[in-house]
């Protein structure tokens, strides 16, 4: 699963999911893409599940670009712990996704197979997506 090798700080504020995506909202590498239509946090496990769904649907000869990276740590306190005593330890990593962001791009593949792969990825994601082509 994806996670940063090294970060400047172990913990981050939660932040807010406001506005639309201004970077990463165009197709840059492949011919087809999967675009987010709503804001969400996508975990590294969900990103990997989407990648597996694409590779299983398309089999050989496809090129996949993952356009998001989980660089935000999410902390959790242990169960049965009283309030206070600081923030919890980092448990998993998420990518902050805003509407318009390209999640995956695909190349060297027919449009019909790419559409089927995009549909399979949509089942794995926690947000609404759409299929985009050049």
UniProtKB/Swiss-Prot annotation:
Compartment(s) where it occurs, according to its Swiss-Prot or TrEMBL record: Plastid, Chloroplast
Q: Which GO terms describe its molecular function?
A: rRNA binding; structural constituent of ribosome
Query: Which keywords, in A-to-Z order, does the entry hold?
Result: Chloroplast, Plastid, Ribonucleoprotein, Ribosomal protein
Query: Per the UniProt entry, what are the Gene Ontology biological process annotations, in alphabetical order?
Result: mitochondrial translation
Q: Which CDD domains match?
A: Ribosomal_L16_L10e (cd01433)
Q: Which SUPFAM superfamilies match?
A: Ribosomal protein L16p/L10e
- Coiled-coil annotation: which residues? none
Matches recorded under InterPro entries: Ribosomal_uL16, Ribosomal_uL16_bact-type, Ribosomal_uL16_CS, Ribosomal_uL16_dom, Ribosomal_uL16_sf
Q: Which Gene3D superfamilies match?
A: Ribosomal protein L10e/L16 (3.90.1170.10)
Q: Which GO terms describe its cellular component?
A: chloroplast; mitochondrial large ribosomal subunit
Has UniProt tagged this entry with the keyword Plastid? yes
Family matches, as Pfam families: Ribosomal_L16 (PF00252)
Q: What is its main location?
A: plastid
- Is-annotated flag, keyword Ubl conjugation? no
Assembly state and interactors? Part of the 50S ribosomal subunit.
Family of the protein in this entry: Belongs to the universal ribosomal protein uL16 family.
What's the protein name? Large ribosomal subunit protein uL16c
